[in-house]
Swiss-Prot record:
It is a peripheral membrane protein. The modification N6-acetyllysine is found at residues 89, 115. It comes from Eulemur fulvus fulvus. Keywords: Acetylation, Heme, Iron, Membrane, Metal-binding, Mitochondrion, Mitochondrion inner membrane, Phosphoprotein, Transit peptide, Ubl conjugation. GO terms for cellular component: mitochondrial inner membrane; respiratory chain complex IV. Pfam families: COX5A. This is Cytochrome c oxidase subunit 5A, mitochondrial. The lineage of its organism: Eukaryota, Metazoa, Chordata, Craniata, Vertebrata. InterPro entries: Cyt_c_oxidase_su5A/6, Cyt_c_oxidase_su5A/6_sf. Its main location: mitochondrion. Component of the cytochrome c oxidase, the last enzyme in the mitochondrial electron transport chain which drives oxidative phosphorylation. The respiratory chain contains 3 multisubunit complexes succinate dehydrogenase (complex II, CII), ubiquinol-cytochrome c oxidoreductase (cytochrome b-c1 complex, complex III, CIII) and cytochrome c oxidase (complex IV, CIV), that cooperate to transfer electrons derived from NADH and succinate to molecular oxygen, creating an electrochemical gradient over the inner membrane that drives transmembrane transport and the ATP synthase.
């Protein structure tokens, strides 16, 4: 209803700007059939992604064997933009991608981002580190706390 009214106002304003001055002495002509507006519904017909599909999509993204440093950073930047803390399996895949690229700095930065995304919920980051501990040990990645970066 509001959208239709706004479209009519826009068409009337456009017609008024093309036709010249209007007022009591120069009434606006009635809109013809060319000015008729169809009501359009603006929905997204896409399906909604489940949590499992979301996780699988990101794990697949980071598990690409030919991922490069730019794609890794782009993926992490996009992932950080969401209003969530990534699941440990997504972070695991991202850390393994860092290892394939020999990018230790990005691996540590990923862990810093996870801590930052956890925000005031102090129980989330230790849980994620606990879940990732076998991967961190296997890949030789130190946490920011082990490196002393939390004190800087």
């Amino acid at each position: 209803m509001l959208g239709t009214a706004l479209r009519r106002c826009a068409v009337a304003a456009a017609a008024a700007s093309r036709a010249g001055p209007r007022g009591l002495l120069h009434p606006a002509p009635a809109p013809g059939p060319a000015a008729a507006i169809q009501s359009i519904r603006c929905y997204s017909h896409g399906s909604h992604e489940t949590d499992e599909e979301f996780d699988a999509r990101w794990v697949t993204y980071f598990n690409k064997p030919d991922i490069d440093a730019w794609e890794l950073r782009k993926g992490m930047n996009t992932l950080v933009g969401y209003d969530l803390v990534p699941e440990p399996k997504i972070i695991d895949a991202a850390l393994r991608a860092c290892r394939r690229l020999n990018d230790f700095a990005s691996a540590v930065r990923i862990l810093e981002v996870v801590k930052d995304k956890a925000g005031p919920h102090k129980e989330i980051y230790p849980y994620v580190i606990q879940e990732l501990r076998p991967t961190l040990n296997e890949l030789g990645i130190s946490t920011p706390e082990e490196l002393g970066l939390d004190k800087v």
